[in-house]
């Protein structure tokens, strides 16, 4: 057997290879171990979103009576582009495969259907139970450290049938999960043998339903499954904002034959639902996990005492270690309970419920009495309607829907009552509102640890500059000795520490911190680009020019890096982080002035102006990044050159490349990115001339790159004779272009 494709368990083969090998195998009377040819069934590829199972079945009806058409979809019900057609009677599959079938003007890919097989357990040589030796004594403390890979020992679980170790490709580690397909098969096999796999238990009288789209609600799905028995509950799984994840569960009151329901075919809104048994995934109990002892790192040497609590220092930064109130062991290092830590609503709900039953309260938050958390709120629901809906449980004191700074609902809120109510009873009930089930839970007020637990860092002021630099101490254009404003904490009289916030312009999209320093402090505005998405201020000051990271605001949308350096001006583009979405202005300083105009990339999307100062003046035109829709020119001066990328923010709305500024005049071509939709040219000045090429990015609509070369620094503020010379040269080139076009 080829080493490139050994017969390992769960190995798969491509459809093309399996088709050829299976055909050869069928002609010789034997079957390959990779898979078996399914009789009277044809593989169909090249299926797009316009094709449904009914149309495909009618298309193949010429070859025989079609038994079933199955289009393979993912978990959300989106077609994967292929499927299978099975026939009732015997048909000549090779004849069908050899024919050419066109559907919706597209040729389908045909082949025999092959059912892939897994090797039986009796053919696999099980490996004996081998336990790695313990680590040397000096590494005993990292034996259970989740952040240490050297001696991290996986939990070894023997196979319940063969008593051998499971395959290393899928070890049964704590908190392991299994996919629904795999769990369905394994659980069915387990149920037939009378034992349950540790990954999860089959939920009786409950069916998994996949392929649910936005048009389906719980009431309709419940009525659809009513033919099999009395439906107890229908639950569509949604995210925190109430948007469906595409699957859910249907539970029945009485005993039903789940296998019979799963084997049936249910079509809903013209779409086939995916059915399977419901499996409740399990995590290993806490008693099976060996807790690691309380180990505290030694304090730093005396010369590093001042950085012990410095949030910008990573060397000796010591996390606060909080023993678990139940086991008295340290929490996992992957989620330490640090000051100001927050917990999610689901985790806090479970932990708070357990805590309340034992008579103590977790430090993360306290349960708010007579208040209920309500999730799954959409834009159609208002506070009055929600209050009337909860009026059956008691006199409603207040309904509060949580919104962002712009007033848009975040999808959840709280309902508080005047009198004492049974919150657990309300949480256990099922409330449907506008045909949608609300998510309920106890309300938990998150807490921050008291200030006495935080070791403040002393007030440290940078030394003043030498005398020869005193004049540049407060010069906003000087980066050498630019001194940040130090604001003491009004309580502790120590310097406030500021942390990095996710999704800020000083970070990449993954949330990793992009260290920036030596800028002036910016004023704070609601919803500005220097704040996080919740509207909290991200104070940044004393920046130096910082490198560009993928997908940062100083790069193009395609993710290619656009290095920016030695600019006063940044490239402006629509929807950039230097604009807000609500229309609040973000003042930027030390630019040359230019007028503001509606709907330009120098403004917010609502049309409010973004005043920028100390730019060279240029005329303003409506609705164009570099010109208006009528073709009037928008001359731009005095930029340093930077590389242009496809789909760059310094391009027109067509997305073609606009290599910037100060070129010598060049001919205008229809549909070029240097023109507006009417074809008028956008003249640019003071670059060396370059020839025009067919199909280049600066001409036709194909978007091919037009290589540019021999950049020069543009002149600064051309005035007087110099300005007249520039316009004279531009006029010469324009006249030459007109002659060329007239000759053509």
UniProtKB/Swiss-Prot annotation:
GO BP: 3'-UTR-mediated mRNA stabilization; cell differentiation; positive regulation of translational initiation; spermatogenesis
UniProt keywords, alphabetically: Cytoplasm, Developmental protein, Differentiation, Nucleus, Repeat, RNA-binding, Spermatogenesis
Chain positions covered by the region annotation Disordered: 1-27, 163-192, 328-357
Segments of skewed composition (Low complexity): 11-27, 176-192, 341-357
InterPro entries for the chain: DAZ_dom (IPR043628), DAZ_RRM_vert (IPR037551), Nucleotide-bd_a/b_plait_sf (IPR012677), RBD_domain_sf (IPR035979), RRM_dom (IPR000504)
The keyword RNA-binding belongs to this UniProt entry's keyword annotation: yes
Subcellular location: Cytoplasm; Nucleus
Organ and tissue specificity: Testis-specific. Expression restricted to premeiotic germ cells, particularly in spermatogonia (at protein level).
Domain (RRM): residue spans on this chain: 40-115, 205-280, 370-445
All residue ranges annotated as the DAZ domain in the record: 497-520, 521-544, 545-568, 569-592, 593-616, 617-640, 641-664, 665-688, 689-712
Gene Ontology annotations for the cellular component aspect, listed alphabetically: cytoplasm; nucleus; protein-containing complex
Biased composition (Polar residues): 1-10, 163-175, 328-340
GO-annotated molecular function: mRNA 3'-UTR binding; translation activator activity
Function summary: RNA-binding protein that plays an essential role in spermatogenesis. May act by binding to the 3'-UTR of mRNAs and regulating their translation. Promotes germ-cell progression to meiosis and formation of haploid germ cells.
Subunit organization: Forms a heterodimer with BOLL and DAZL. Interacts with PUM2, DAZAP1, DAZAP2, DZIP1 and DZIP3.
Record-stated family: Belongs to the RRM DAZ family.
Miscellaneous: DAZ genes are prone to deletions but also to duplications. In a population of infertile men, DAZ genes deletions are associated with oligozoospermia but an increased number of DAZ genes is not a significant risk factor for spermatogenic failure.
Disease the record associates with this protein: Spermatogenic failure Y-linked 2: A disorder resulting in the absence (azoospermia) or reduction (oligozoospermia) of sperm in the semen, leading to male infertility.
Free-text domain note: The DAZ domains are essential and mediate the interaction with DAZAP1 and DAZAP2.
Protein name: Deleted in azoospermia protein 1
Taxon lineage: Eukaryota, Metazoa, Chordata, Craniata, Vertebrata
